Regions:
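Mature N-terminal, pre-catalytic/accessory segment of carbohydrate-active enzymes
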Residues: 1-68, 110, 158-160, 293-294, ...
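A conserved amphipathic helix/loop scaffold
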Residues: 347-574
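Catalytic domains of carbohydrate-active enzymes, especially glycoside hydrolases
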Residues: 20-44, 107-115, 196, 251-263, ...
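The substrate-binding groove and active-site-proximal loops of carbohydrate-active enzymes
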Residues: 8-16, 38-47, 82-102, 136-149, ...
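Hydrophobic targeting/anchoring helices
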Residues: 80-82, 119, 149, 162-163, ...
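Short, acidic/polar
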Residues: 13-31, 94-108, 178-189, 245-255
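Active-site-adjacent "subsite" loops/lids of carbohydrate-active enzymes
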Residues: 2-20, 51-113, 124-127, 153
């Protein structure tokens, strides 16, 4: 594991270009064991001349630090052409945008042997020029085709003309369920780049500005991009924005648990401002390096969450983040996981035209699948018959304020977002919730299908309409109750979903579970220590930290489980 720091163009000019400022910058880098600094040459109108970059590069080399170049492809008054929609992205049909980006790579490849493209290589432009170029394609397909087509003429070509062996890195943002809408196509984009960096910058999950993003999203994003892009997926990149010290180190640990081999801290200016996360990260580096060594020796496994590339999420946006936050060992995959013991299918999986026959074969082999109402709606009547339930032609968003576990009713700290159209037919209702008016709705159903089991988890996150209503384009627009399940309710869900994996976890939501062959790791996102039971073993998890378990062994099942009550009335027509 190595650490690097990204210096924006303004950071370079302020903290590294003046010789009198360099000692202070080095004093911030040394405690974090930084071995490389990315020196950005362009961010809109912020610009560092090549001669200055070369001088800083040589200074860093004399201090034993490697360097690389970087660009944030954002518009400025004198750089590129701004798109006509709300976010500060470029219009890539504009000739000036193309000319300016190509010029950057010509200039900077002469200085650096490695260049990284920050996560603004996207667009939401709908100008007449873009509309004409789009033709009959969807906006999403057009944008992906456009940006993929520009990599070689605007980036690789100009860079290699200066330095034939130059290495280019693409950095993807964290909003994986929205990539395909705004031009990101990881499957095709990874091919021309030497390496892939992943945004694991989830920040503070309790603040609105950067979205109420679950702290598990960085892990999910990295693992899914690794599934798409393979071993090119090398680095994780996260920042200090809105973070407490603990939020900041959570990002580091989640990146390492996902398999990152390099951690890039954004940005040098925040290190110079004495963000408290840096001191805490420096203190916890031995723990982080030890964890990285353990993870690198092993192959992850768990609940295979299937998201094909370029798949729409509908009302299951960022579903996997919430599953992981509930303590389910989510393992994102981008191809059908034929050998998986258990699969999880949200609306994303239904983008695979073979999803239903593959599901049938999976069940026929005696395996387990967990699906959402959104998947069943897209997959159609055959999938609904397999599950023993029905869903309406459109989702009926509602909230469950109470959950029945066995004979007890639990009032929830935050209501659960569910689909009120789900009706249990022949399926057994394992958990039921109470929605407005006292109506009961299934939360978890089970149907035996041959030797297999098909579960329906009535989990709704949010959809395009929810984003628009909140004025949000990319990230989670509100906190969800699924992230705050009390221990008895979370345990009842886990009991059913973890059984095929021979794992048992009794804990509140906010405790993550990660599995490898012969090992497991628990991660406590809470601000206080949490007592849990894992496979029958009582453990106390420190706040904001990992707890590694070697040879966890199979789960020990208690004599009676609280979630074994049946609620066959739930979700039936009233």
């Amino acid at each position: 594991l190595t650490l690097s720091v990204y210096a924006t163009a303004s950071d370079v000019l302020r903290h590294l270009a003046p010789p009198t400022a360099r000692a202070a910058a080095l004093a911030r880098l040394r405690p974090l064991r930084v071995s490389r600094v990315f020196l950005e040459g362009r961010r809109g109108d912020e610009y560092v001349p090549p001669a200055t970059l070369a001088e800083v590069r040589d200074f860093l080399a004399a201090q034993g630090l490697a360097s690389a170049g970087g660009i944030a492809t954002v518009p400025g008054t004198n750089f590129g052409v701004r798109q006509n929609e709300g976010l500060g992205w470029l219009n890539w049909e504009a000739e000036k945008t193309r000319r300016d980006v190509a010029h950057f790579f010509t200039e900077n490849a002469a200085v650096f042997d490695t260049l990284i493209v920050d996560d603004f290589f996207c667009t939401g432009d709908t100008s007449p020029a873009s509309a004409a170029a789009r033709g009959t394609r969807s906006w999403a397909a057009y944008r992906r085709d456009l940006l993929v087509s520009l990599i070689k003429p605007l980036m690789l070509g100009p860079a290699r003309a200066q330095r034939p062996d130059v290495q280019l890195i693409i950095k993807f943002p964290q909003w994986y369920d929205r990539f395909h809408l705004f031009g990101y196509d990881p499957e095709r984009m990874a091919e021309p780049f030497a390496q892939v960096w992943v945004g694991t910058e989830v920040r503070n999950p309790h603040t609105r500005r950067m979205g109420y993003v679950p702290p598990t999203e960085g892990y999910v994003n990295f693992r899914w991009l690794h599934a798409v892009c393979g071993e090119k997926t090398t680095g994780a990149w996260f920042d200090h924005i809105e973070c407490t010290a603990e939020n900041f180190t959570d990002q580091a640990f989640q990146s390492v648990l996902a398999g990152a081999r390099e951690l890039t801290l954004f940005r040098l200016g925040d290190l110079m401002a004495d963000h408290p996360g840096d001191a805490l990260l420096a203190q916890r580096l031995p723990e982080l390096f030890e964890l990285a060594a353990k993870v690198r020796q092993r192959t992850p496994h768990g609940l295979a969450w299937y998201k094909p590339p370029n798949s729409d999420a509908e009302d299951n946006l960022y579903l996997a983040d919430y599953l992981a936050q509930m303590g389910l060992p989510v393992l994102p995959v981008a191809r059908w996981p034929a050998d998986a013991r258990e699969v999880c299918l949200g609306a994303q999986a239904a983008a695979d035209p073979e999803a239903t026959p593959r599901l049938q074969a999976h069940l026929a082999a005696g395996h387990t699948a967990a699906v959402t109402p959104a998947f069943l709606r897209r997959a159609g009547p055959t999938a609904q018959r397999l599950a023993g339930v029905k869903v309406g032609p459109a989702a009926e968003p509602t909230e469950a304020s109470r959950v029945q576990v066995g004979a007890r009713h639990h009032v929830l700290p935050r209501p659960l977002e569910v689909d009120g159209s789900l009706v249990a037919g022949t399926a057994r209702v394992r958990l039921a919730g109470t929605v407005a008016g006292g109506t009961s709705v299934p939360l978890l159903t089970e149907q035996r299908t041959g030797r297999g089991r098909l579960l329906v988890l009535n989990l709704r996150t949010f959809d395009e309409g929810d984003l628009h209503a909140a004025g949000e384009w990319l990230l989670c627009p509100k906190p969800l109750g699924w992230s705050e399940l009390p221990a008895p309710v979370a345990g009842a869900v886990r009991e059913v979903l973890l059984a095929p994996l021979r794992v048992r976890l009794e804990a509140p939501a906010g405790v993550g579970l990660y599995l490898w062959n012969g090992a497991a790791c628990l991660y406590n996102f809470h601000d206080v220590a949490v007592r849990v039971r894992f496979n029958g073993r009582a453990l106390e998890l420190p706040p904001h930290g990992p707890y590694w378990v070697e040879r966890p062994g199979p789960a020990r099942r208690p004599a009676a489980a609280a979630s074994e009550g049946d609620f066959h009335g739930a979700g039936r027509p009233r």
